[in-house]
Curated annotation (Swiss-Prot):
This is UPF0282 protein MM_2966. It comes from the Archaea. It comes from Methanosarcina mazei (strain ATCC BAA-159 / DSM 3647 / Goe1 / Go1 / JCM 11833 / OCM 88). SUPFAM superfamilies: Metallo-hydrolase/oxidoreductase (SSF56281). InterPro entries: RibonucZ/Hydroxyglut_hydro, UPF0173_UPF0282_UlaG_hydrolase, UPF0282_hydrls. The lineage of its organism: Archaea, Methanobacteriati, Methanobacteriota, Stenosarchaea group, Methanomicrobia.
């Protein structure tokens, strides 16, 4: 089994995209990328835009030879979009996907916006999308719908993915944020070797200490029972999240890392550092409007 993470907050942009290769199959999970429209009252810094472009290019390059595409839910950082925003992966950039098998979160318990995006995507593809929750097929399994964060808070649901080859098991936990024990127990029941999952959103005002404690307990459960736990996404939109990750790593013998570290790279928490990026590298007035029109690029902002 080969696992390659294509994008995540530790790569500088919002994503949870990865490739898993087993035998003749190449499975692309959550092929999307996005940037926060506003953080600290600021639009994305061009350094972040450059990072999002790198993730987009990696996703498009990896589509060659892909046999399966999984979409865990219909947020813009997890799927190609119908040109809603210049920092995402537009469906118009996709190659011909004829012959690729899709595995998707069904239409149940999703927002009206997510339902619209699902419809737009299958209209673009020219065929309907399956509802894959609870399905198993040839080494690939999908969970029933599980909460996007805390249960019964109105944040919708996501679908987790299990990929196995011989004695190796990879689990993509999507955006569960370690805030629902049932979802975590589902992962443990799958007996994972490697888990790639979103950590808790410490940066959000509605995230309370009790939720952080619950997330830590769930993270410890995963870290003690999986050989490698890759925690990223919501967790690393805040610098304190990286310290939370390192504290967790110090509590267990197994490997606990962010996505960049798993791929042998240095973490770049650009989302969390937007304010300091503007202070260190001021952005000319009108740059974002010019970028959207194709009149400005990121060449001067490559790290």
């Amino acid at each position: 089994m080969q696992i390659k993470i294509l994008g995540c907050e530790s790569f500088g942009a919002r994503s949870l995209a990865c490739i898993v290769k087993t035998g003749e199959r190449k499975i692309l999970i959550d092929p999307g990328v996005a940037l926060a429209r506003l953080r600290y009252g600021l639009l994305p810094h061009p350094v972040e835009v450059a990072a999002a472009l790198r993730v987009r290019e990696k996703i498009l390059a990896e589509l060659e030879g892909t046999t399966d595409i999984v979409i865990s839910h219909y947020h813009g950082d997890h799927m190609p979009m119908k040109a809603e925003d210049p920092y995402q992966l537009p469906v118009e950039a996709l190659p011909d996907l004829k012959g690729v098998r899709f595995w998707c979160k069904g239409p149940g318990n999703i927002s009206g916006l997510s339902a619209r995006r699902r419809k737009e995507f299958f209209r673009y593809l020219g065929h309907s999308l399956p509802a894959s929750e609870g399905i198993s097929s040839e080494g690939v399994s999908f969970s029933p719908a599980v909460p996007h964060g805390t249960r019964d808070k109105g944040f919708g649901t996501v679908m987790m993915t299990r990929v196995s080859e011989e004695d190796e098991v990879f689990v993509h936990g999507s955006d569960i944020q370690l805030l629902d024990r049932e979802a975590v127990m589902q992962i443990l029941a799958w007996k994972p070797s490697v888990v790639f999952v979103s950590g808790p959103p410490l940066y959000l005002s509605h995230h309370v200490p009790e939720a952080s404690n619950e997330a830590l307990e769930n993270a410890l459960l995963l870290a003690e029972n999986a050989g490698t736990l890759i925690l990223d996404h919501h967790l690393l939109r805040f610098l304190e999240g990286y310290r939370w990750l390192k504290d967790l790593a110090g509590m267990v013998k197994n490997t606990v890392v962010c996505a960049a570290e798993f791929m042998g790279k240095k973490p770049e928490l650009l989302d969390a550092q937007r304010k300091s990026l503007y202070e260190e590298m001021p952005v000319p007035r009108g740059w974002h409007e010019a970028y959207e029109k194709g009149e400005a690029g990121v060449e001067d902002y490559l790290l």
